[in-house]
Structures are given as structure tokens and as C-alpha cells.
UniProtKB/Swiss-Prot annotation:
GO terms for molecular function: L-malate dehydrogenase (NAD+) activity. This is Malate dehydrogenase, mitochondrial. It comes from Brassica napus. Its main location: mitochondrion. NAD(+) binds at G36, A37, A38, G39, G40, I41, G42, D62, N122, I145, S146, N147, M256. Belongs to the LDH/MDH superfamily. MDH type 1 family. Substrate binds at R109, R115, N147, R181.
Length: 341
């Protein structure tokens, strides 16, 4: 009974996803590469991308254990062909021909650590991967998950500039987990179905640099000042909440993989010409004086088609934005400095 119900549920979900995208006969060939595919985020992300009907080729790369992940995921009877690549010598093969590269590589957060505590380790890892991307698939869209995103995205931009291959429309910091978390929290506070909720999250992707825009939430509900503060803080502290709940034995891997898959799906839809695909992301931006900023962007065949204006902000949000500017500015500068050492 359970198996038949699961099959029916899976079939229904797959048909729904196909309807939201394209019919199976019109879907272009798309290669997606995941760098860090054997890690805590990479493995569930690989599973979710294997289930995505927009993916025709799934390339899984890591420094170890990738063949096992590829063999396991490869048994799933969906469209994409899966190949696992392991070690520096195979990075080029993993990247060649990729339309979309997703990077969850790096060490996870542990209790008591901030995203910036991860900087020295993860920045070095990301720097090497970006150099390879610039060489082997310079025209791919790249989704950065590795923390601290506020710094790793500027590092990537500088590396691409040095290689003469920088296109600001193709570089994304994945902040979708912030949006996922705030939707869940808002739905609980506003007592509305979470599936109907949309709440933008702007500025950055590190603790206090995350600012939900409840004034633009749909469906709209009036939250008290205390509720705004509590829900904002819970969104900002979401990673810490998971790490503490896992008692030091893990970080937010499953929810991050889900969020990463959502944003990757949006990027693929944009590449395939689906109109009006809008998501929040940390990108090069001119809507504030900060060179990188998380806000709503319209995705298209070239990546970022438009960085949307912030729209009207409440007094609470205006105050929050002003308070966050110095912190996000310093993390951007930290990334630029590291890339140019």
C-alpha cells in the first residue's frame, strides 16, 4: 500500500513539475555540474537534481567518494544521465559543456561558528574551483552555495575578471534558503497556508545581513512589532538553530539542498525561455551603493535579465537596511582582498 501510494505521489509530482516547465518533447539538453557532490549538501542536492526533468546530464564532482554517489543516484529512473568525477585531474571533464554549475563545496558550519569563521578554508577551496570554471565552462551560470556567500561571490567575480571571462549576469549567490525559512516562519505567525506564501529576503546571506521584507509578503498579514522582530531573528538564526538541534553533528544540509534545487530549477527555466521567473539572489547590483546585494532578480536566457527595485519599505525595514550596510560592505571587501592576494 505504501509503495503504491508513493508511486502515485511521485508520478503526480513529476507530471506537475513537467507541466510547470515544458512538455518532455520540448525540453532542451542541459548539463548541470555539482561541485562538492559527495558532501552533506551535495548528496541530497544530487538526488533532487536527478529528479528534475529539465536536466539531461548530471555531472557530480568531489575530491573523494563521488563514484559511489553517482552510482547510487544513477539508478533512479529519470531523464538525466549521471557521471561521477573524483579528484583534481577530473575537474575539467566534470565542467566541460556545463550550462549550470552549483557549488556546495567546502566545510560545514559547526556550533559556535559563524559563516565568516569558515572564510579561510572555504575561500581557498572556492578560489580553485572558480579558476577551473573560468577555463572550462566560462559561459555557464554558476550558483554559489559555499559560505560565506557574502564573500565567496565577490571572490568569484574577481577571479573571472582576471581571466577576462566575467559576466555579472551569470554569477549568483544562492540565498533561497533565507526565503524558504522566512516563508515557513511567516506562515506560522500569520496563520496562512505556507504554500501560498511569498516573502522576499534581501541584503546578504549571513546571519544579521539577512533582511526579510514582510511589508511585501503575500498574502498580507499585519504582524506586531514583536512578531516582526522574532520572525526576522529566527530567519537570521536559522542555521544556528539546526546546528544546535543536531548537537554538533551536522548543519542545515537537507533544507539547503532543497533551496539549492529550487534556485537551480529557476535558473534552468530562465535558460529555457520560461517568462517571468523571479527569485531572490545575491548578485552584482546597482540598486544600492553596495556592489553586491541580495534582492529579487528576473532570470532569463542570459542569466540575470533584470535586478528588480526594492520597492516600498516599511520603517522597520528601512532601519534594518541601514543597520546592515556596514556589515555586508566589509564582507564584500574581505572577498575582493582575498581574491587579489
Amino acid at each position: 500500500m505504501f509503495r503504491s501510494a508513493l508511486v502515485r505521489s511521485s508520478a503526480s509530482a513529476k507530471q506537475s513539475l513537467l507541466r510547470r516547465s515544458f512538455s518532455s518533447g520540448s525540453v532542451p539538453e542541459r548539463k548541470v555540474a555539482i561541485l562538492g557532490a559527495a558532501g552533506g549538501i551535495g548528496q541530497p542536492l544530487a538526488l533532487l537534481m536527478k529528479l528534475n526533468p529539465l536536466v539531461s546530464s548530471l555531472s557530480l564532482y568531489d575530491i573523494a567518494n563521488t563514484p559511489g554517489v553517482a552510482a547510487d543516484v544513477g539508478h533512479i529512473n529519470t531523464r538525466s544521465q549521471v557521471v561521477g568525477y573524483m579528484g583534481d585531474d577530473n575537474l575539467a571533464k566534470a565542467l566541460e559543456g556545463a550550462d549550470l554549475v552549483i557549488i556546495p563545496a567546502g566545510v560545514p558550519r559547526k556550533p559556535g561558528m559563524t559563516r565568516d569563521d569558515l572564510f579561510n578554508i572555504n575561500a581557498g577551496i572556492v578560489k580553485n574551483l572558480w579558476s577551473a570554471i573560468a577555463k572550462y565552462c566560462p559561459h555557464a551560470l554558476v550558483n554559489m552555495i559555499s559560505n560565506p556567500v557574502n564573500s565567496t561571490v565577490p571572490i568569484a567575480a574577481e577571479i573571472f575578471k582576471k581571466a577576462g571571462m566575467y559576466d555579472e549576469k551569470k554569477l549568483f549567490g544562492v540565498t533561497t534558503l533565507d526565503v524558504v525559512r522566512v516563508k515557513t516562519s511567516y506562515a506560522g505567525k500569520a496563520n496562512v497556508p505556507v504554500a501560498e506564501v511569498n516573502v522576499p529576503a534581501i541584503v546578504g546571506h549571513a546571519g544579521v545581513t539577512i533582511l526579510p521584507l514582510f511589508s511585501q509578503a503575500t498574502p498580507q498579514a499585519i504582524l506586531s512589532g514583536d512578531a516582526l522582530t522574532v520572525t526576522t531573528k529566527r530567519t537570521q538564526d536559522g542555521g544556528t538553530e539546526v546546528e544546535e538541534a543536531k548537537a554538533g553533528k551536522g548543519s542545515a544540509t537537507l533544507s539547503m539542498a532543497y533551496a539549492g534545487a529550487l534556485f537551480a530549477d529557476a535558473c534552468l527555466k530562465g535558460l529555457n525561455g520560461v517568462p517571468d521567473v523571479v527569485e531572490c539572489s545575491y548578485v552584482q547590483s546597482t540598486i544600492t551603493e553596495l556592489p553586491f546585494f541580495a534582492s529579487k532578480v528576473r532570470l532569463g536566457k542570459n542569466g540575470v535579465e533584470e535586478v528588480l527595485d526594492l520597492g516600498p519599505l516599511s520603517d522597520f525595514e528601512k532601519e534594518g537596511l541601514e543597520a546592515l550596510r556596514p556589515g555586508i560592505k566589509s564582507t564584500i571587501e574581505k572577498g575582493v582582498k582575498f581574491a587579489n592576494q
